[in-house]
Swiss-Prot record:
GO cellular component: cytosol
Biological-process GO terms, alphabetical: diaminopimelate biosynthetic process; lysine biosynthetic process via diaminopimelate
Summary of the function given for this chain in its UniProt record: Catalyzes the condensation of (S)-aspartate-beta-semialdehyde [(S)-ASA] and pyruvate to 4-hydroxy-tetrahydrodipicolinate (HTPA).
Alphabetical list of PANTHER family matching this protein: 4-HYDROXY-2-OXOGLUTARATE ALDOLASE, MITOCHONDRIAL (PTHR12128:SF66), DIHYDRODIPICOLINATE SYNTHASE (PTHR12128)
Name under which the protein is recorded: 4-hydroxy-tetrahydrodipicolinate synthase
Site (Part of a proton relay during catalysis): 46, 109
Associated pathway: Amino-acid biosynthesis; L-lysine biosynthesis via DAP pathway; (S)-tetrahydrodipicolinate from L-aspartate: step 3/4
Residues where pyruvate binds: 47, 204
Source organism per UniProt: Caldicellulosiruptor saccharolyticus (strain ATCC 43494 / DSM 8903 / Tp8T 6331)
Matches recorded under InterPro entries: Aldolase_TIM, DapA, DapA-like, Schiff_base-form_aldolases_AS
Length: 295
């Protein structure tokens, strides 16, 4: 059984002016997704800026979201690390806190080999008893999980899914062919329909932070056989999706949410605020779609 089908939001983490986590706003964001069509909440994925958090804060954010959701939707905890023992530690803690699943980015910077990937994920698999989503995002990590490697990983009982953000649809199709028991989620908002067309069952989405219903609807339309409606909505959203990635994620999505009145603060350094030129491009994309700007 899949961890979820549909749209999983890669939830942002709101910060106060002095950069502490704004738990009051975080609670409102969680409630927003509970009230809308979001199918799962991914806390402390890349969009949630866990690389800027010490472990105690990272785990407190995970705990808070799990408690707030209270079992109403699956909560998947981002606990990836390029240090295997650290990844194991965070995984065990997230499981203890009640996470429904774990999202693990591949080791980054030190990168490793395909053999190292298998050994890394085997250690994590053996340490927990909840589902693991492998996250392949070579543009950030410098490391690509090959389909043959994913086939080996699929033999591990807790490796249940992959978030595929390589941008290579042929590779996604090869994973679907070689790994029939692995659920595939698009890791790119501009490729939801293409990934679904080769066997995907959903998306882990940045876009869903601001348009949760529309993101869910793309997947629902496609999986219900309304392929043309899914395609039309995917294309209609493309200008906003492009604007959300005009600078490094999550800079634009946080700016968009602030424009919409969510008051999520700015990203932590080394990420910064948007340039004025790009901010105007983002603002125009939101207005053109019909989103109410409250600034």
């Amino acid at each position: 059984m899949p961890i979820f089908k549909g749209s999983g939001v890669a939830l942002i983490t709101p910060f106060k002016d002095e950069e502490s986590v704004d738990f009051e706003v975080l609670g409102r964001l969680v409630d927003f997704h509970l009230e809308h069509k979001t199918d799962a909440i991914i806390v402390c994925g890349t969009t949630g800026e866990p690389s800027t958090m010490p472990d105690d804060e990272h785990l407190e954010v995970i705990r808070f979201v799990i408690d707030r959701v209270a079992g109403r939707k699956p909560v998947i905890a981002g606990v990836g690390s390029n240090h295997t023992k650290h990844a194991v530690y965070l995984s065990k803690k997230a499981q203890e806190l009640g996470a429904d699943g774990l999202l693990h980015v591949t080791p980054y910077y030190n990168k490793t080999t395909q053999k190292g990937l298998i050994e890394h994920f085997k250690e994590i698999n053996d340490a927990v008893s909840i589902p693991i989503i492998v996250y392949n995002v070579p543009s950030r990590t410098g490391l690509n999980i090959l389909p043959e490697t994913m086939k080996e990983l699929s033999k591990l009982p807790n490796i249940r899914a992959i978030k595929e953000a390589s941008g290579n649809i042929t590779q996604v199709a090869e994973i679907a062919m070689l790994c029939p028991d692995i659920d595939i989620y698009s890791g790119n908002d501009d490729q939801i329909v293409p990934v679904l067309s080769v066997g995907g069952i959903g998306v882990i989405s940045v876009l869903a932070n601001i348009l949760p219903d529309e993101t869910h609807d793309i997947v629902e339309y496609f999986l219900n056989g309304q392929v043309e409606k899914a395609k039309e909505l995917q294309l209609k959203l493309l200008p906003i999706i492009k604007a959300l990635f005009i600078e490094v994620n999550p800079i634009p999505v946080k700016e968009a949410m602030n424009m919409m009145g969510f008051n999520v603060g700015r990203p932590r350094l080394p990420l910064t605020t948007m340039t004025e030129k790009n901010r105007e491009i983002l603002k125009k994309a939101l207005i053109d779609y019909g989103i109410n700007i409250k600034e």
